[in-house]
Amino acid sequence: MFEKFHRGDIYSADLSPGIGSEQSGSRPVLILQNNVGNCFSPTIIIAAITSVSKKSRKFPTHYHLNDRCGLVKPSVVMLEQIRTIDKSRLKNYIGHLNKDDMENINKTLLCSLGILSLIHLSEPTRH
């Protein structure tokens, strides 16, 4: 079956096996890869998503989703947990992030990769 994946889609995925602190098991993931790659590559770049609890700490590499996008629990996209997986690991479509969420994901991703510093994220834009 041919499935068309889009940047910003959320799917359930089987991330097992994981080693050490890698996210593993069946969990939601956010597709980060560009749509050209999504169309032609057998692999796909994702970020793991986890549910949050009252004890969860806030990290600058986390983006909180609350209960948007078809997720049943308040959740966090962990942009320090990026990996390339085979498309066969993707199971069920859950939802899609809106433009505003994806713009914030992009900023958080740039921070996680060290391309944009945390200081720049908190400074107002100057024209």
Ranges and model annotations:
Residues I119-H127:
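Conserved small/polar residues in nucleotide/adenosyl-binding loops
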Residues M1-L118:
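Conserved functional hotspots at enzyme active or ligand-binding sites that engage polyanionic ligands
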